């Protein structure tokens, strides 16, 4: 039998997209899944136990990719999904056709992240056009990725 080379092109080690957490354990500035969207909790309040039921947790959260506000009301004993959110920094190589061309830490290129919309994307484009070396922060959760910030690379790092 011939030896076969197996290559696996995954960035995560098969980690689940989300994990369960009891409502009462969620915290402000933490993450939660509401209506199948990864969100950052901006406000939460708890109502007292009623005559017929459990204490309720009222969550107000912002979608980490779209910025839309979402709300949820759940019994404090229920489990909610929490997204696995990761942040990585990449060096910006090029901006082409609405996508960022980024270099990973091991020298590979990553070309599947869109230029962010609005002011962030405009500033990123103009500073790149000025010839600045930029480091872009990419946030990823539940199979989606987006550039959320950038900074100028320290001189002499490239």
Curated annotation (Swiss-Prot):
<protein>
    <recommendedName>
        <fullName>Eukaryotic translation initiation factor 5A</fullName>
    </recommendedName>
</protein>
<dbReference type="GO" id="GO:0045905">
    <property type="term" value="P:positive regulation of translational termination"/>
</dbReference>
<dbReference type="GO" id="GO:0043022">
    <property type="term" value="F:ribosome binding"/>
</dbReference>
<keyword id="KW-0694">RNA-binding</keyword>
<dbReference type="Pfam" id="PF21485">
    <property type="entry name" value="IF5A-like_N"/>
</dbReference>
<dbReference type="Pfam" id="PF01287">
    <property type="entry name" value="eIF-5a"/>
</dbReference>
<comment type="similarity">
    <text>Belongs to the eIF-5A family.</text>
</comment>
<dbReference type="InterPro" id="IPR014722">
    <property type="entry name" value="Rib_uL2_dom2"/>
</dbReference>
<dbReference type="GO" id="GO:0005737">
    <property type="term" value="C:cytoplasm"/>
</dbReference>
<keyword id="KW-0385">Hypusine</keyword>
<dbReference type="InterPro" id="IPR012340">
    <property type="entry name" value="NA-bd_OB-fold"/>
</dbReference>
<dbReference type="InterPro" id="IPR019769">
    <property type="entry name" value="Trans_elong_IF5A_hypusine_site"/>
</dbReference>
<dbReference type="GO" id="GO:0003723">
    <property type="term" value="F:RNA binding"/>
</dbReference>
<keyword id="KW-0963">Cytoplasm</keyword>
<dbReference type="GO" id="GO:0003746">
    <property type="term" value="F:translation elongation factor activity"/>
</dbReference>
<dbReference type="InterPro" id="IPR020189">
    <property type="entry name" value="Transl_elong_IF5A_C"/>
</dbReference>
<dbReference type="GO" id="GO:0045901">
    <property type="term" value="P:positive regulation of translational elongation"/>
</dbReference>
<feature type="modified residue" description="Hypusine">
    <location>
        <position position="51"/>
    </location>
</feature>
<dbReference type="GO" id="GO:0006414">
    <property type="term" value="P:translational elongation"/>
</dbReference>
<comment type="function">
    <text>Translation factor that promotes translation elongation and termination, particularly upon ribosome stalling at specific amino acid sequence contexts. Binds between the exit (E) and peptidyl (P) site of the ribosome and promotes rescue of stalled ribosome: specifically required for efficient translation of polyproline-containing peptides as well as other motifs that stall the ribosome. Acts as a ribosome quality control (RQC) cofactor by joining the RQC complex to facilitate peptidyl transfer during CAT tailing step.</text>
</comment>
<dbReference type="InterPro" id="IPR008991">
    <property type="entry name" value="Translation_prot_SH3-like_sf"/>
</dbReference>
<keyword id="KW-0648">Protein biosynthesis</keyword>
<dbReference type="InterPro" id="IPR048670">
    <property type="entry name" value="IF5A-like_N"/>
</dbReference>
<keyword id="KW-0251">Elongation factor</keyword>
<dbReference type="InterPro" id="IPR001884">
    <property type="entry name" value="IF5A-like"/>
</dbReference>
């Amino acid at each position: 039998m011939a030896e076969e080379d197996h290559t696996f092109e995954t960035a995560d080690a098969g980690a689940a997209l989300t994990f369960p957490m009891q409502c009462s354990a969620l915290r402000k500035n933490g993450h939660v899944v509401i209506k199948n969207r990864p969100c950052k909790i901006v406000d939460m309040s708890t109502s007292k136990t009623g005559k017929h039921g459990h204490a309720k947790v009222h969550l107000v959260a912002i979608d980490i990719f779209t910025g839309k506000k979402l709300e949820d009301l759940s019994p404090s004993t229920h489990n909610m999904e929490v997204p696995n959110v990761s942040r990585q920094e990449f060096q910006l190589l090029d901006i082409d056709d609405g996508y960022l061309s980024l270099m990973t830490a091991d020298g590979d290129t990553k070309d599947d992240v869109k230029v962010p919309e609005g002011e962030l994307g405009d500033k990123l484009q103009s500073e790149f056009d000025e010839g600045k070396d930029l480091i872009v922060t990419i946030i990823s959760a539940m199979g989606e990725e987006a550039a959320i910030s950038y900074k100028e690379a320290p001189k002499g790092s490239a």
